Amino acid sequence: MEEKKYKLTEESIKFNGKTLYRIESLIDFGTIKKGDKGGFIESERNLSHEGHAWVSDNAKVFGNARVYGDAGITDDARVSGDAEVYGHAWLYGESMVCCNAVVYGNAWVSGCARVSGRAKVFGKAQVYDDAKIFGDAKVYDNAEVFGHAWIHDNASVYGDANVFGDAWIHDNASVYGNAKVYDNAEVYEDGGVLDNAEVYGNAHIDGIWICDDDKVQ
């Protein structure tokens, strides 16, 4: 039988129609000491007793969501629905991962960013500010998505690519390599931006590929 690393305390809150309980560590593990208070979960299904995974501060995990491995949910972050956060992934700020979304590896989600639908964020990717990743979108490797950028449908952002500002990547579009898409630019259909290319301003990339050192606005 696995050793329990935390317990549900009697301190509870009502959130989204559910009762969540603050957790308290029963043992020392990682940087957590026995007796440390954590964040809030609905039940023990939400946080594994194995590994160093932890929910701290006023973070909340509920529904069928699962946090495991060495993942950390901090500040006022939320994980809900059937979402999973694992590996060494971390959620900060007021970020939210919900529905069937998965965040894993060494990925970070912070600020007021949202990852939902069946989206995946993994590798060393970072999603922050007010960025939204949803649908079946993927953000991975060392990619960063921030500002008010939206990535959705079957779009992918990876490599060392950056998507920010009010940029919008959707349909089956891809942004990768060292590419940058920003301002109000939109990449969609089967379009792609790669290598050291930059797409910005009010540019619309519809089913074509921008590569090398090209700049389009």
Which residues does each predicted region cover?
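A detector of tandem-repeat and repeat-rich interaction/domain scaffolds
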Residues: G51-W209
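Terminal amphipathic alpha-helical/low-complexity segments used for targeting or macromolecular assembly
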Residues: M1-E50, D212, Q217
